[in-house]
């Protein structure tokens, strides 16, 4: 019977507690982007989450389950057994997950989920999660020709209509590369945050401003922009449509915000 471990993780919650007491199932499918999966697991934990990894056979062709066991500090599910792990993770109980994250998500896996096919540990758990109302976030990774395929597009649209958050990949070098870990973690946090700002448009100004006195002199301030960036990110996580305008700062703007 599958049971999560009681890990001792010295870095848990070091970046925040937005995911404290939240259980995330990180589903990993067969893509070269699986090399980012340990980083994704660790970042979720740094925001307070408990992470359980589920790997398809294709994912195991790229990385070993031992790596994800180390990254998550939990047992890894690589096949479904008579213990019915896909039921343990979605029914009320100590192992129940709050969200299912598929990262990376291949065209094959996404199309199977859209069609109700459940022939791998990942697709079986996804089908169970959909039937139980558990939120799903997917981070696609595939060649650009697959991303542009009309059938794949139809399948992605079908997933969106049933409330699966399909993140936009980074189109680069002829590939639809998995989006950044920051975007993935932000999407998970947003999906698990009450959307009490939904339908609200928020305009945030951050950082220093400059007002000319004459062609040489200005009036300014030493604002770092941290407060404005934090307010913009929090409003976005709570469902707002956020526009952020910033003066020159040393900060990197939140990538999920315009």
Can you say where each PLM-predicted feature lies in the sequence?
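A cross-family phosphate/adenosyl-ligand binding-site feature
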Residues: 1-225, 229-258
């Amino acid at each position: 019977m599958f049971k999560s471990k009681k890990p001792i993780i010295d870095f848990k919650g070091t970046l925040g507690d937005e995911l404290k007491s939240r259980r995330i199932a990180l589903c990993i499918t067969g893509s070269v982007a699986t090399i980012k999966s340990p980083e994704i697991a660790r970042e979720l934990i740094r925001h307070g989450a408990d992470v359980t990894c589920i790997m398809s056979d294709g994912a195991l062709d790229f990385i070993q389950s031992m790596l994800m066991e180390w990254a998550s500090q939990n047992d890894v599910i690589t096949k479904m057994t008579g213990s019915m792990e896909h039921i343990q993770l979605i029914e009320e109980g100590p192992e129940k997950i709050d969200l299912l994250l598929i990262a990376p998500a291949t065209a094959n896996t996404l199309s199977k989920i859209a069609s109700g096919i459940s022939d791998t540990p990942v697709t079986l758990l996804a089908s169970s999660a959909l039937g139980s109302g558990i939120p799903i976030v997917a981070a696609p990774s595939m060649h650009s020709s697959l991303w542009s395929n009309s059938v794949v597009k139809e399948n992605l649209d079908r997933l969106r209509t049933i409330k699966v958050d399909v993140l936009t990949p980074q189109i680069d070098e002829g590939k639809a590369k998995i989006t950044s870990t920051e975007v993935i973690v932000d999407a998970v946090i947003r999906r698990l945050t009450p959307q009490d700002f939904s339908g609200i448009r928020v305009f945030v100004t951050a950082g220093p401003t400059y007002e000319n006195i004459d062609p040489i002199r200005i009036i300014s301030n030493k604002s770092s922009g941290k407060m404005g960036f934090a307010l913009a990110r929090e409003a976005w996580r709570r469902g707002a449509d956020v526009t952020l305008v910033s003066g020159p700062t040393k900060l990197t703007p939140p990538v999920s915000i315009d």
